[in-house]
Structure formats: structure tokens, C-alpha cells
Amino acid sequence: MGNKKIVLAYSGGLDTSVAVKWLTDKGFDVIAACMDVGEGKDLNFIHDKALQVGAVESVVLNCKAEFAEIFVGAALKGNLMYENKYPLVSALSRPLIAKKLVEVAKEKGATAIAHGCTGKGNDQVRFEVAIHSLAPELEVIAPVREWHWAREEEIEYANQNGVPIPADLDNPYSIDMNLWGRAIEAGVLENPWNTCPEDAFFMINSVEDAPNEPEFIEVEFKEGLPIALNGKIMELHEIIKEVNIIAGKHGVGRIDHIENRLVGIKSREFYECPAAITLLKAHKDLEDLTFVRELAHFKPVLENELANLIYNGLWFNPATKALIAYLDETQKVVNGIVRIKLYKGLATPIGRKSTNSLYSEKLATYTAADEFDQAAAVGFIKLWGLPTQVNAQVNLK
């Protein structure tokens, strides 16, 4: 009888490369699976390295389009920002990666899935809750959480077992990147008083180094999602990639966040999210133009709840599904074009138009073209203030 098969979420880094050997020693045939969500890595190198370190099979999946349309799409429709600051960069990719791991496991006849998360972060929760939501029968193993090695012990194990040490191992920062942004933590950033060194940034110029002239872009939306950039129809993942470059050049999207983690601790995180910040601002601006007042005031309440659900690893929870369905309904009128000024760290919507616009210049103007019936205000004010007036008459004696 052969070894049991296990699918490992493989990144090509030291932790998951050592995990291949560690799991093999535990009696598993390791199938390495790498999901491309736009991190910009050399996927051929990762594919080959997995086999080099002992995986019996290496699978690389291009998930950029699905990640953008389904997961980032929900974040855009919902203007999602955890604690009003973090655009859910890593939190959005984890359910997709978990879904693909389950699909590979079922296709290959694996009985278990492994990931490279520590026992201290949010991602262990996100992966395991998602996997068990989709395939409760699969065992989940977290080698890094189990072996409790210091970095030096891990390197020693790698050297003893012929696992290549990555060239960038001395990088003082822990990095996670996808299409929607880049997360930076550890090193000197663990002291919240310290300023983030410039060498930590990859996507975004400093404000000082940003161009001295503004740049203007136009983003067209259809039912809440971008479909064109500067008049050119593009796939969503292509628009995000392009806006990352343009907005990053102008210093847009650096975030310094003291974050309340799901596991109960505070962490200090830096994020680079040029496209996320730019497109979220444009999207919200278009909603302001096309939403009735009641929807504009109520939707943010549910946005906050949905951001918390996704951050906390509950993408496949029925509550998340219901809230995303609500978002989809609201977005039917979010069609139009937003013009954005990019300059010295700011993404500022400066123009917008829509066939679903509820803005009436004839009602808003103070010129002779005004069609607003000001005489109607007298009766409106009387009825609107009646409960307050009655309260005063009864209680202010």
C-alpha cells in the first residue's frame, strides 16, 4: 500500500520547501500546489523547485482572473476596508487558495492538505476554516506550527536535508503579495514607533519621489466593477495591474496600520495598495452619484460586517454569501465613469458621470433654471419636525 497523498500550499520559500521534506519523512507523498494570484513570482522556478526538494508532483494554477472577478470584485462592490483602513489584501486570497487546494486534493485522491502558516497569525484560521467548510473529511496539517523551530534550527534542517536556502533569506521583512496589494511586517516594523524604512517598499514611490505633475485617469464601471481604463476595455485583473503601476508611481496607497488580529493580538502592518485605494475611492464616488439616500446610508453598516467576516476567515459562511448577494443587488445602478487625479500620495475623484445618476442640476442649481419647489419646504419642515415639537411641548415645562 502506497503512502497517503497530501496537497501542500507551496510558495517556493524556506518554510514550505522544508515542509515538503518534513511531510515526506512523515510518510506522505507531497503534491505541491502554487496558486498565482498576482504576486509576480517566477512560477516556472517554483514549479521546478517543488520537485527538486522532494514533491512527487507540482501543480501551478493561474488564478488571477478568478481572484479579481470574484474575490476582489466583492471587495470593490462592498468598499471593503477592515477597521476602515486595510483593503483585505491577504484575507481575500486565502479562501481562493483554500478552494483550489481542495479541488487539487479531490482530483489527486489526497486525504490531507498542508499549509505553511505559523500558529500566531490569521492565515492559519482562514485556511483551515475554509478547507473544512468545503471538505470536512480532509485532514489539515500545519508543519510550521507543529515543529516549533527557531529560524536557525530550520536552516540547519534544510542544510542537512539538501533543501536550498533562498537567496533573500536575510530580508528582515515578512512579505505577502497579490494583485490587490502587498503586506509588510516584522523586523524594525514590530516597534510601532519606528518609521518604515524606504527599502521595505516595492510598489509605491515616496511622496517626495513622486512626480511633481499630477496624472489623470478615467475608470469606467459596469454594475460596480471596473471594465475600462482610459477608454480601453480590459479584464479586471489587467486594470488592477495597470492602476497599481500608475498610482504607485504617484505615491498612492501606503498604509501604516495597528491591526487587531483575529487571534487576539495587535500587530503592526504596512500595506502597499495603490490600485485598491484608487479604485475603491472611484467606486464609492460613483455610488454617491447613483444611490438613493437610504441605500447610501445603510450599505456602509453591512460593509463593515462583511469586511469583518472576510478578515476573520468566514468567506464560505452563509452570512458572507447573503451579504455578497445584497451587494450584487445594490450594484445594478453603479454604472459610469469616474475621473481621478493622482498626485503626491492622493487619489482624488474630480469628475463623474452615469446614465443612472440621481443628481439633477435643475434641482440643485441656484440659478434661474432652478426647478426645486421651495414653497413646498414650509409644509415639509412642519411635518418633519412635528415629533420633536410635540416632545418639547410636553416635556419642556
From Swiss-Prot:
Transmembrane in keyword set: no
Any one Gene Ontology BP term: argininosuccinate metabolic process
Residues the record lists as binding L-aspartate: 118, 122-123
A single GO cellular-component term on record: cytoplasm
Protein name: Argininosuccinate synthase
Main location, first listed in the record: cytoplasm
Binding annotation for L-citrulline: 86, 122, 126, 174, 259, 271
Similarity comment: Belongs to the argininosuccinate synthase family. Type 1 subfamily.
Superkingdom of source: Bacteria
